[in-house]
């Protein structure tokens, strides 16, 4: 629960200091790139997460490795995380920043769960329908889950719209079991 509160507080602060949509996008890309680098270089992650390593050493490592690669705001943000002993939450902060940035940019992220991969045409129809309904730009990520048998499940903004065959079969089963003969 602490991680959620910390990640929300710091990611919100980073979104709030952005002065325009381009800066929000730039910060998002920089955070995603940085976390990606941490994931691909375990030794670097280990060093930066090491509680025995001094703050000054960690900041020096970041400065040497990323001063030409990261925006000054992001580098300073990472320094603050190190100073406040919050760097261990960087992955959660990146996830929360991603969510807040998309929301601030008016982009609705949707996960479309289907039993088989959906071609571009049906996916585009869903995207257009959602765009008209929510008056927002829509980004769809298709996730294949054979367990749902058929139909689809839409997951967006903490809402789930389940129109899967699996759910319909479960409803049918309940109604058959509770039916009075």
From Swiss-Prot:
Q: Which UniProt keywords apply?
A: ATP synthesis, Cell inner membrane, Cell membrane, CF(1), Hydrogen ion transport, Ion transport, Membrane, Transport
Q: How does it sit in the membrane?
A: Peripheral membrane protein
Give the source's domain of life in one word.
Bacteria
Q: Name one GO molecular function term.
A: proton-transporting ATP synthase activity, rotational mechanism
Q: What is its main location?
A: membrane
What the record says about family reads: Belongs to the ATPase delta chain family.
- What is this protein's function per UniProt? F(1)F(0) ATP synthase produces ATP from ADP in the presence of a proton or sodium gradient. F-type ATPases consist of two structural domains, F(1) containing the extramembraneous catalytic core and F(0) containing the membrane proton channel, linked together by a central stalk and a peripheral stalk. During catalysis, ATP synthesis in the catalytic domain of F(1) is coupled via a rotary mechanism of the central stalk subunits to proton translocation.
Q: How does it assemble?
A: F-type ATPases have 2 components, F(1) - the catalytic core - and F(0) - the membrane proton channel. F(1) has five subunits: alpha(3), beta(3), gamma(1), delta(1), epsilon(1). F(0) has three main subunits: a(1), b(2) and c(10-14). The alpha and beta chains form an alternating ring which encloses part of the gamma chain. F(1) is attached to F(0) by a central stalk formed by the gamma and epsilon chains, while a peripheral stalk is formed by the delta and b chains.
Identification of the protein by name: ATP synthase subunit delta
């Amino acid at each position: 629960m602490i991680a959620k509160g910390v990640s929300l507080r710091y990611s919100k602060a980073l979104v709030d200091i952005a002065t325009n949509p381009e800066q929000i996008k730039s910060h998002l890309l920089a955070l995603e790139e940085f976390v990606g680098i941490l994931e691909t270089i375990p030794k670097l992650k280990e060093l930066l997460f090491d509680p025995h390593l001094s703050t000054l050493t960690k900041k020096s490592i970041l400065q040497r490795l990323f001063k030409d690669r990261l925006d000054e705001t992001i580098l300073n943000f990472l320094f603050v995380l190190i100073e406040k002993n919050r760097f261990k939450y960087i992955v959660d902060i990146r996830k929360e920043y991603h969510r807040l940035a998309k929301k601030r940019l008016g982009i609705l992220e949707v996960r479309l769960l289907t039993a088989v991969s959906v071609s571009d045409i049906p996916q585009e129809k869903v995207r257009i329908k959602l765009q008209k309904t929510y008056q927002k730009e829509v980004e769809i990520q298709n996730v294949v889950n054979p367990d749902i048998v058929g139909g689809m499940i839409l997951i967006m903004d903490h809402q789930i719209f389940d129109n899967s065959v699996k759910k319909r079969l479960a409803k049918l089963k309940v109604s058959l079991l509770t039916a009075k003969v």
